[in-house]
Regions:
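Residue-level recognition of conserved structural "scaffold" positions that shape functional pockets
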Residues: 65, 87, 136, 145-147
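Shared catalytic-loop signature of beta/alpha-barrel
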Residues: 2, 8-27, 32-130
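Extended hydrophobic packing segments that form well-structured cores
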Residues: 139-169
Length: 169
């Protein structure tokens, strides 16, 4: 189906040369940190598929920009995972619902990596091998505060100081 990141992350030109020589689509993963990276790689012909990881591109806003660049250039996108907790998985599920995410993603059930997670309900895989996007507001998951408290080692409170002139520092 694809070769995912077959060369070094900073080797965009050789990815382009490889993609010209083979029929199998090259999928860039670690090479894509922004929509500009995606635009550049697509323009060079370095890939025919892009993997987006929220943590790598810096969050939803940039992930949406990468998805838009790919969609405008008919480049399929899929969501990669990085062993996230249920909170991170919830973000990945939300991202994977965007129109350009046309390939199966790398989001799995919480239980694959965590005996007990910090979010509820658990992310589960259906008998068909799919994940269902929650229908609740927001990300559709709640935090298991009892679990978080049991894992908490220390709590700190950060207070923003206000100067005599009323400016915060």
């Amino acid at each position: 189906m694809m070769l995912e990141q077959p060369l070094a992350h900073n080797d965009i030109l050789d990815h382009a040369e490889l993609q010209k020589q083979i029929k199998t689509p090259v999928c860039l993963d670690e090479s894509i940190h922004s929509s500009e990276d995606a635009r550049h790689a697509i323009g060079l012909g370095s890939c025919r598929i892009i993997n987006v990881k929220l943590g790598r591109v810096g969050g939803h806003a940039e992930a949406k920009r990468v998805e838009k660049v790919c969609r405008e250039n008919n480049i399929p996108v899929w969501c990669g995972g990085m062993l996230e907790s249920g909170v991170g998985r919830a973000h990945n599920i939300a991202m994977a619902t965007l129109a350009g995410f046309t390939l199966p993603g790398d989001v799995s059930a919480n239980s694959r990596y965590w005996a007990e997670d910090i979010s509820e309900p658990p992310v589960t895989v259906t008998a068909r091998g799919t994940l269902l996007a929650p229908e609740k507001p927001g990300l559709g998951f709640d935090l298991n505060m009892a679990r978080i408290d049991s894992l908490t080692v220390r709590k700190e409170t950060v207070v923003r100081k206000t100067s005599a002139s009323g400016q915060r520092s």
